[in-house]
A protein has these predicted regions:
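Gly/Ser/Thr-rich helix-start
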Residues: 4, 28, 51-58, 65-68, ...
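N-terminal glycine-rich flavin-associated loop
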Residues: 4-42, 69-88
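Acidic/polar active-site rim loop that often engages polyanionic ligands
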Residues: 16-20, 59, 108-112
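Short acidic (Asp/Glu) patches
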Residues: 31, 61-63, 92-98
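A gly/ser-rich beta-alpha-beta helix-loop segment of oxidoreductase catalytic cores
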Residues: 37-75, 146
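Phosphate/pyrophosphate- and phosphate-bearing ligand-binding catalytic cores of soluble enzymes
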Residues: 80-216
């Protein structure tokens, strides 16, 4: 690998609440940010409570679940360009769409984000978060490490069903496996390497493309 990997973690996790706006540094976890919104009586981020990842990554890929996504609540994000320039960009300027933004194409680094919410009732917000957490436990392979839902949903299809129909549920490469509980997840059954995970994903995409002429 020729390049630099920047881990934005412990030193970039501050969360501040001002009225209905929450400003979050990129290293803060989505789960922690969702709890901050709940504690402030703000609704709109319940969908993100169970997504495994950071705010920076969520902005970069326009993360979403259960009918909500980052672009619905994002005011703007501060990014660092390759030239060392700091920019503040709106969701429209970031070209947010389904699991996409211009951040990867332009090699931006997300530093922080501001989200705008609506006032809500704390008990209803918590109830919705609990409801989604229960749904995740029932349907997703939370008993194994994973990076969450792995494949983008092709328009008009469900990725998990395509993978299952291709006979790939349980397909294994080393320690990496297509989950037997939910085919849209790649899990680590123990000792999986990045190379094994990447190879498995490519094989799944290749086999689904061959059988159904659909790219995931």
């Amino acid at each position: 690998f020729r390049g630099m990997i920047i881990q934005i973690g412990k030193n970039f996790q501050e969360i501040s609440v001002k009225d209905t706006v929450i400003e979050v540094q990129a290293g803060a976890l989505l789960s922690r940010t969702a709890r901050a919104a709940w504690n402030a009586g703000l609704t709109g981020f319940e969908f993100a409570a169970g997504i495994p990842g950071s705010v920076g990554g969520a902005v970069a890929m326009n993360a979403g679940a259960y009918g909500g996504e980052v672009k619905d609540v994002l005011l703007d994000a501060e990014v660092l360009t390759q030239e060392g320039e700091f920019l503040t960009l709106t969701g429209e300027e970031l070209d947010l769409s389904y699991r996409h933004s211009c951040i990867f194409e332009k090699n931006y680094v997300v530093l922080s984000a501001r989200f705008s919410f609506e006032k809500g009732e704390s008990d209803k917000i918590k109830a919705r978060m609990d409801e989604l957490a229960k749904a995740r436990r029932e349907k997703q392979p939370l008993e194994f490490p994973s990076a969450g839902s792995t494949f983008k949903r092709p328009e008009g299809y469900f990725a998990g069903k395509l993978i299952q129909d291709a006979g790939l549920k349980g397909y294994t490469v080393g320690g990496a496996q297509v989950s037997e509980k939910h085919s849209g997840f790649v899990v680590n059954r123990g000792g999986a390497t990045a190379e094994e995970v990447a190879f498995l994903i490519k094989q799944v995409q290749k086999k689904v493309m061959k059988q159904f002429n659909v790219m995931m």
